[in-house]
Structure formats: structure tokens, C-alpha cells
Amino acid sequence: MSHDLLQALAIFAAGLAAGTINAVVGSGTLITFPTLLAFGYPPVLANVSNNIGLVPGVASGVHGYRAELAGQRRRIIRLGSASVCGGLVGAILLLVLPAGAFKEIVPALIGIALVMIIFQPRLARWMAARQLARAAAPAGERGADGDTDGAGGTTGAGGTSTVRVVAPVAKETPVQIGGPVLWVLVFLSGVYGGYFGAAQGVLLIGLMGIAFTDTMQRINAVKNVMAGLVNGVAALVFVAATHIDWGAAGLIAAGAILGGQLGARIGRKLPPWGLRVLIICVGVVALVKLLA
């Protein structure tokens, strides 16, 4: 078997593995990027070719999680704009900044994300309790923008007014916390994703897991969309502004498409604690590799 064929098979296999991991957690770049470096690709060329190759795989993973995306349109539109803007900025930074400029803070970002994921259940419960208490408070005790789901009033025969307030149900209407702060944090994760992207999914799940009282599977589905938007807009910048190795990108894409479907099937069957443990393990591996 020729060296070129072995190299092609290795890059395809790396794309398959990366697509699988990206659909479940993220950090597939930590497989494909080092593989390209091992075959002699220059770092920036390897990074941009890898980014473009992984875009179809992320799209495949999003399709696999389409059931979990139901009812999340507003969330995706709001945070998607942050991801697109961040990915655009990150891609431009990759092309104009020195290669090592951003690498210094990458381990810190991943470490913060891991801490958020470890303590996510406790923090999410605490923040949700505060939000629900505020929503259930009488109108005079809340701000003008406070909402009450199911509030209604009836007037009795004697002219007296009876007000009925039904507290929101967390399971049916997931509490959303963060507002502009969460938008900025997702934007910053997009900047990081457009620049390099390894463990971007860990960062996003850490942020959204604390901000939303929702299932890990639904949060993971949104994470796939956000990562896809970041990779997609960064890919457009790279295609327009720099050289791409389309052979490597094509091999990664072919493997990542298959991996995205496989990863979605695996990830959707994992219980919340299992998905969280897997995310933490991948994040630790990413941290060790980046610090090595």
C-alpha cells in the first residue's frame, strides 16, 4: 500500500473520529489537527483545511439531533447571532495575529469550561430557583419586564376581582438565564472557535448548561448548531482569504459526515450523567494535550 494511500486513509479515519466526537461533545479538532501536522502540513494551513473539512460533519450531527432542537428556535436565533459574529472575528484573528497569540489562553478557557460543567447541576438549580421565585412574585414586587405564565383574572357577581396566578412549570418552559452576558460569552466562545475551535463544544455546553434549566441532550443539540455556525462562517472567511488544501479538507469532510450521524446516535442514547462524564473526560484530554 502506497504512502499516499495510507495518508489518505489516516486523514479520513481522523475525520470519522472527529465527526463522531463533535456530535457528542466537541473537540474533534484535537484529532484531525494533530493528524495533519503529523503529515507535514503547516499549522495555519492544517487549521483552516481542518475547519472546512469539519463543517459538513457538524451539519450531519445537527441533522441527527433534529428532534432535540424542537421548540428552541428563539434560543438558536439569539445565540446563533453571537456565534456567527464571534466566528467571523476569530477567523480574521487567525489570519492577522501571530500563531501563538491566542494559544496562551486556550488552556484557561477549557479549564473554566470544565469547572462549569462539573458544578453545572448545582448552579443551574440555584439560578433556576431564583428565576422562578422572581416570576412567581406579585406584580408589584417584580420589575416591569417580569412575566407570569398562565396569569388570569375573573370578576365575580359582587364586582370583586379574583386574580389567579399559575406559577411557571420548569419542565414545560425551561428557565433561561444570562441575557446580554450570555450573548457576550457565546460570542467569545465563537471567537475562540473561529480561531482554533478545539473544545469549543465543552465551552458552549458549560455556558448553556448553567444558563438553561433544560436537558443535556437539548443543550447538546443547540451546541451542535452553534459550533456549526462558527465553523461555517470561519470557513467562508478562509475560502475567500487564504490557501486551502482541498484534498485534506475533502477527506476530513467525508469521514466527518459519517461520524456526525454515528455520534448523534451514540449521544442521544447517553443518560445526562453519562454525557456529562464524557464531556469532562474529553475536556481533560484536550487540556492535557494543549499543555503538553
Located regions from the model:
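Selected transmembrane alpha-helices and immediately adjacent juxtamembrane segments
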Residues: 1-42, 131-220, 250
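Residues within membrane-spanning alpha-helices of integral membrane proteins
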Residues: 8, 14, 51, 106-110, ...
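Residue-level signature of the transmembrane alpha-helical core
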Residues: 12, 16, 20, 51, ...
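Alpha-helical transmembrane segments of multipass membrane proteins
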Residues: 16-20, 35, 62, 88-92, ...
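Transmembrane helix-loop junction
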Residues: 38-39, 95, 104, 210, ...
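Membrane-interface alpha-helices at helix entry/exit sites of multi-pass transporters
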Residues: 41-49, 73-78, 213-224
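Selective hydrophobic functional segments
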Residues: 48, 52-113, 231-273
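Transmembrane helix exit motif
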Residues: 59-70, 108-143, 161-171, 285-292
